[in-house]
Amino acid sequence: MHTFLTARLQAIEDVSNRNLSMLELILTRAIVTHWIILDLVLNLIFDSLITSFVIIYSLYSFVARNNKVLLFLLMSYAIFRFIVMYLLYIVSESID
């Protein structure tokens, strides 16, 4: 009887350890996913600020000096950053 109870308790302990390992893995992945999303959101905000400043500066430069080449380069950069931000948004949504 004693060996049966010992074996049964050992089996219960093994199952509990597996469940705790699975729970730890799930929690770790959830925390990492949230940090990745937070990093993407902060990068999105920072890139949006930089892009808006680039657009404002390029418009100011166009009005002040009528420099069409600079405006073209800065607007091309802004469009490129918006495309990259959209692709990052798609990737972050596909992670969830």
From Swiss-Prot:
<dbReference type="InterPro" id="IPR008447">
    <property type="entry name" value="Prot_L2"/>
</dbReference>
<keyword id="KW-0946">Virion</keyword>
<keyword id="KW-0812">Transmembrane</keyword>
<keyword id="KW-1035">Host cytoplasm</keyword>
<dbReference type="GO" id="GO:0055036">
    <property type="term" value="C:virion membrane"/>
</dbReference>
<feature type="transmembrane region" description="Helical">
    <location>
        <begin position="71"/>
        <end position="91"/>
    </location>
</feature>
<dbReference type="GO" id="GO:0030430">
    <property type="term" value="C:host cell cytoplasm"/>
</dbReference>
<comment type="function">
    <text>Early protein involved in early virion morphogenesis. Participates in the formation and elongation of crescent-shaped membrane precursors of immature virions in cytoplasmic factories.</text>
</comment>
<feature type="transmembrane region" description="Helical">
    <location>
        <begin position="36"/>
        <end position="56"/>
    </location>
</feature>
<keyword id="KW-0244">Early protein</keyword>
<dbReference type="Pfam" id="PF05803">
    <property type="entry name" value="Chordopox_L2"/>
</dbReference>
<keyword id="KW-1133">Transmembrane helix</keyword>
<keyword id="KW-0472">Membrane</keyword>
<dbReference type="GO" id="GO:0016020">
    <property type="term" value="C:membrane"/>
</dbReference>
<comment type="similarity">
    <text>Belongs to the chordopoxvirinae L2 family.</text>
</comment>
<protein>
    <recommendedName>
        <fullName>Protein FPV129</fullName>
    </recommendedName>
</protein>
